[in-house]
Amino acid sequence: MGSLTTAPDWYLMRGSGVVALLLLTAVVVLGVGTTKRWRPARTPRFVTLALHRSISLLAVCFLAIHIVTALIDPYAAVRLLQVVVPLPLGPYPFWLGLGALSLDAIAALVATSLLRHRLSLRTWKTVHWLGYASWPLAFAHGLGMGSDSSTVWFLALAGASAGAVALAVGTRLLGARRPYPKYLGTALETGGPA
């Protein structure tokens, strides 16, 4: 941390980035869980889906805080264009570029989720596969760019996050595929057969 930055900006940027990564981990695990229909026996599917959506919204909020504080912090020196386009600028262009690519994937996920009632299942599902790409990009961004990436507490959180996602995705990829309805519409909203 340099003299050009204020401690609250710096800590808010770091903290919101870590919280966003943890929430994105939960979103991926819950997303995989909804495709596998993981849930307690007495919990309707729409509850699991609502939790997935709610945590997704919270993750996007913390991601927005992370981005805004990075933009206003003079020490971070992040430009607006760098947030969405991986550019070879600044001291860590590769790691910042991974964050930009992750944000782009997350933006596509949010947009298609908001428009899911107007999209075919195939389109929505194809774009939703970006979730599997956005998480490792965000994870690598945090490991490479984060000022806490060499601390024991961060490495423990990162290891737990990686383990949770690897277990969920591994289970998803090794499990049997289930058919989906032609259109998402009411099946996802009501917890009906999907």
For each predicted feature, which ranges?
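Membrane-embedded alpha-helical bundles that constitute the cytochrome b-like, heme-associated redox core
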Residues: 1-194
